[in-house]
Amino acid sequence: MNGRRLLPGKPIPPSEIPDYSIRRDTLEEVFAEPFRLRLKRIAELVKQSGEPLEGNIFYPDLKDGYAGEPPEGDLAPARRNVWRAVRFKERLLEVGVNAGHSALLALSSNARLEYYGVDIMSHAYTAECVDFLKGEFPGRVHLFTGDSREVLPWLVGRRAELAFDVFHVDGGHTDEVCRSDMGNCIQIARGQRGRHVLLDDVHASWIFDVYCEFVSRGDLTTETFFGDWEEAGRNVLARIE
């Protein structure tokens, strides 16, 4: 699966064009100027913290020269997959916020989307980056701080109130934490139609095995949008059963 090349639709009024989108005939990413400025500001906040940048959907792990650099081309399939996952959704719960790059992408792809993040706050830059996004997207950005293995079970009790319809699991990268996060997200979504989970880093065998475990148990069904999904993205989307 390499992404479908589709005939472009009718022109969209400028006021309705999202800050991040893709050209359906070429798969080229389209970054609006507000998006570029926000991406630049996040880079500045990370630099000011003095910490190296943890890998994300725009830049590889510990890349030093990211400030002012365009997004990494090799990661474009992963970014396009996030766009595919969130563009018709209403409320996203992401496990693992980091510097907020995935949050920025999701919020910029869908003007209706509300974002909720869970993060253990191990990086000095995370709080400032989230505060910046809150200012840029008023009323649409929320943060739960703490270990996902404690926060997510708490959210199970608020599942009806919050009604998340898409989850992004990109937190602790051990099989134990991944299995816990996936299981809890499934519990939050259980019994509700149209719920999906996006799992990152499936190029790691232990993460891929956790995903296969849930598929084999009948908890998940892989979603490809009729072959539009890009396997090169190293992330996978599933419908929660």
Feature map (PLM): residue ranges:
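A short alpha-helical cap/connector motif
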Residues: 1-168, 172-241
